[in-house]
Amino acid sequence: MNTCITCGMPFTGEHENEIGMETSYGPVCIHDCEDGDIKEPEDIFAGGVAYFVDNVTDGDFDLAERLTRRNMLSLEYWQENPFEELEGPVASESEYAEAMAKL
């Protein structure tokens, strides 16, 4: 499955045509790039937190941050390009599985 290298969004269904740019790592979604560049990692992290708050955690900001960290740390791009917000607590396996089941 083709997914965004910065957030993991699958390019299927309603997101099928949301590739914003291609990089040597792979595709980046339209939400995580601007003017031909990948957005700042802090902005992508904030977008991930907002997504989880709105769609999964019923407003639990702390859980949304932990889910975002776990998600981003699972992606090769962030393993090779770490940044400060990735340091901190991550969601447990069960928290992450429960969150993904809601999507």
Set out the residue ranges of the language-model regions.
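N-terminal pre-domain and mature-chain start segments
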Residues: 2-5, 101-103
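Short linker/helix segments within small regulatory modules
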Residues: 16-26
